[in-house]
Amino acid sequence: MALNLRINRQIRAPRVRVIGSAGEQLGILSIKEALDLAKEANLDLVEVASNSEPPVCKIMDYGKYRYDVTKKEKDSKKAQHQVRIKEVKLKPNIDDNDFLTKAKQARAFIEKGNKVKVSCMFRGRELAYPEHGYKVIQRMCQGLEDIGFVESEPKLNGRSLICVIAPGTLKTKKK
């Protein structure tokens, strides 16, 4: 948030509505009286609403106000979690141990809150038997259904079969 508020001598209006440091209304005063009140309290006069008539000014510590606003912005950015799509690549004739390793990797991605794109790559004549790829993808989806749900059903896209699994359960998705 850009803090481009007018403070103290930057305020151009001859009369302003003043709000005290505790939030109480002090009324409409001349700019000189308002600045004197702020100076007595060792605080700043900050124009918070310049588009009203007369402009609204508040007596506050501007440095502390700026610090609080930037701190709130940082906290809100920390609270946001960006969902990334991670990919796990499989082959239609994958061995059991290799499959378990890939399933463990996909489980770790989902537990961290990321979506997982499971793709089964076909090479050469493997494309003649896409049902083998569907079986591998279905096995992966069934292994992860306790922590995630199938966001997009398996689709054949060129030489690969693609499916997306998202974190959560199907019940939380529908809400």
From Swiss-Prot:
UniProt cross-references to Gene3D superfamilies, sorted A to Z: Translation initiation factor 3 (IF-3), C-terminal domain, Translation initiation factor 3 (IF-3), N-terminal domain
UniProt-recorded name of the protein: Translation initiation factor IF-3
Presence of keyword Cytoplasm: yes
Gene Ontology molecular-function annotations: ribosome binding; translation initiation factor activity
PROSITE patterns the record matches: IF3 (PS00938)
Family matches, as InterPro entries: T_IF-3_C_sf, T_IF-3_N_sf, Translation_initiation_fac3_CS, Translation_initiation_fac_3, Translation_initiation_fac_3_C, Translation_initiation_fac_3_N
GO biological process, one term: ribosome disassembly
Keyword entries, A-Z: Cytoplasm, Initiation factor, Protein biosynthesis
Top-level taxon in the UniProt lineage: Bacteria
Subunit and partners: Monomer.
One cellular component term from this protein's GO annotations in UniProt: cytosol
Source organism of the structure: Chlamydia trachomatis serovar D (strain ATCC VR-885 / DSM 19411 / UW-3/Cx)
Function: IF-3 binds to the 30S ribosomal subunit and shifts the equilibrium between 70S ribosomes and their 50S and 30S subunits in favor of the free subunits, thus enhancing the availability of 30S subunits on which protein synthesis initiation begins.
Similarity-based family: Belongs to the IF-3 family.
Pfam families with a match to the protein in the record: IF3_C, IF3_N
PANTHER family the record matches: TRANSLATION INITIATION FACTOR IF-3, TRANSLATION INITIATION FACTOR IF-3, MITOCHONDRIAL
Subcellular localization(s) per the UniProt record: Cytoplasm
